[in-house]
């Protein structure tokens, strides 16, 4: 299971604050958030306290993160995924990247989310 699969499972779980266990004390982050397809977006930046406040402000009911692709090398992890309602309807697409510290926690975190584009899942080679 990738870093982001574990992180988002905690964030989307019954206690989203457990996701902070994946976050270094001195984290720096930016979240670029678009609600619609009009090109307007909002940026959230800060450290661990601001990330906690972002969790406080979010309505986590009825939707979750779904990682479509994940990878990494040299302490950098990324994930391409979707936020989806519980009925499977796509809300938006996200691309997340993090640099991990020596303990495997988020040190730098950047994510962009938009409903304006969707990616097709990769075909599965059953041979």
Spans of features found by a protein language model:
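Aromatic side chains
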Residues: 7-8, 22, 29, 54, ...
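Short, aromatic-enriched amphipathic alpha-helices that serve as compact interaction elements
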Residues: 1-15
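A solvent-exposed, acidic/Ser-Thr-rich amphipathic alpha-helical stretch
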Residues: 17-73
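A beta-strand edge to alpha-helix "cap/lid" segment located at domain peripheries
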Residues: 52-127
């Amino acid at each position: 299971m990738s870093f982001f699969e574990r992180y988002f499972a905690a964030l989307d779980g019954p206690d989203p604050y457990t996701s902070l266990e994946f976050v270094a004390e001195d984290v720096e982050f930016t979240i670029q958030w678009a609600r619609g397809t009009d090109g307007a977006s909002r940026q959230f930046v800060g450290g661990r306290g601001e990330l906690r406040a972002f969790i406080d402000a979010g309505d986590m009911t009825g939707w979750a993160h779904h990682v479509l692709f994940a990878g990494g090398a040299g302490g950098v992890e990324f994930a391409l995924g979707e936020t989806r309602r519980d009925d499977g309807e796509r809300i938006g697409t996200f691309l997340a990247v993090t640099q991990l510290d020596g303990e495997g926690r988020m040190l730098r975190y950047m994510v962009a989310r938009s409903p304006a584009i969707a990616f097709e899942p990769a075909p599965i080679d059953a041979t």
